[in-house]
Amino acid sequence: MTPLFRKAVWLLFAVSVCAFAGSLAAQYVLGMEPCVLCISQRLCVLATALCAAIVLMCRPRRKAGGLFGAVFISIPAVTGISVAAYQLWLQSLPPGTAPSCGAPWTFRLKGWPLFDWFEPVVRGFGNCAEPDYLLGVALPVWSVAYFLAVALTVWWAWARAK
């Protein structure tokens, strides 16, 4: 792994941890109630941080290892982009016509062995069709920008490292 690629992955890890902490702060400090899709995006941010940490711990030495790292980090980023884009589409529909965004995560994971520990991360019963704003911009737009920045950064660093 080249120094540039390693620094980029460290940056992505740090930004992902901050974004995850920010999503928890928005819920528990600012009082924003996340919906199922918001929580899915939160889990994609967490997965991005975990993937970056795994790439940093594995320290791939060959170019193929760097390619693996870029693909590995891109998977949750692309998933997050698709979830946020779906939520933006839901929010663009006329009021009352948006379909349900699914069962709450707390219901889906109730029987999971680590549920009591993980429950604060997946708790939320907000409406996916009602937008929340940060600095005048809808939160799914911020999510798309974050995930797009992750994907572009990791592929830029990989291309520069070749």
UniProtKB/Swiss-Prot annotation:
GO molecular function: electron transfer activity; protein-disulfide reductase activity
Gene3D superfamilies referenced in this protein's UniProt entry, alphabetically: DsbB-like
Keywords: Cell inner membrane, Cell membrane, Chaperone, Disulfide bond, Electron transport, Membrane, Oxidoreductase, Redox-active center, Transmembrane, Transmembrane helix, Transport
Alphabetical list of InterPro entries matching this protein: DiS_bond_form_DsbB/BdbC, Disulphide_bond_form_DsbB, DsbB, DsbB-like_sf
Residues annotated as transmembrane: 9-25, 44-60, 68-85, 142-160
Disulfide bonds: 35-38, 101-128
Topology class, membrane: Multi-pass membrane protein
Chain ranges on the Periplasmic side, renumbered to this chain: 26-43, 86-141
Record-level GO BP terms: protein folding
GO cellular component, one term: plasma membrane
HAMAP family: DsbB
Family membership noted in the UniProt record: Belongs to the DsbB family.
Name of the protein described by the UniProt record: Disulfide bond formation protein B
Species for this entry: Neisseria meningitidis serogroup A / serotype 4A (strain DSM 15465 / Z2491)
Gene coding for it: dsbB
